[in-house]
Amino acid sequence: SVPLVQMHEIGHNLGHSHSGKGGVTYADPTCNMGNKGSWTDGGTNFCFNAAKTWANKWYESYHVMIDPTSNTHDGTLVGINAVKDGTIAETGQDVVLKIASSGETDLYVMFNRQAGANNEVPQYGDQVVITEQYRETGG
């Protein structure tokens, strides 16, 4: 099986559902659960989106929960590789923001740095990406 399928199935084993966009089940080009990478034996080097990263508690020391009714965020978003290569600052730099809502979904925000483990992300590289996720799915 190609690496994209393997990573996608690992995502299911972690409890994740598909990552869609605009009503299309497989459409998120920033996440292995969106099936938008290369379907070759070489695969595509990219990661999971902000909602999945939050649910897995990856880089949890750099997660920030925001209640938009009572606070804001004043900091810098950095890519996941800043943690891995040790260039992240002790304070003021974060990997994932969760913006809690009173509705059925929350928003997750991440800087989709196109480098290292995410150097072949199919779209939105080096951009801030916002993912909307139903709360009850767990990621």
Region spans (language model):
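Extracellular hydrolytic enzyme modules, especially secreted metalloproteases
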Residues: S1-N118
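Short coil-to-beta strand junction motifs in C2/discoidin
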Residues: V121-V128
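Contiguous ligand/interfacial binding patches
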Residues: E136-G139
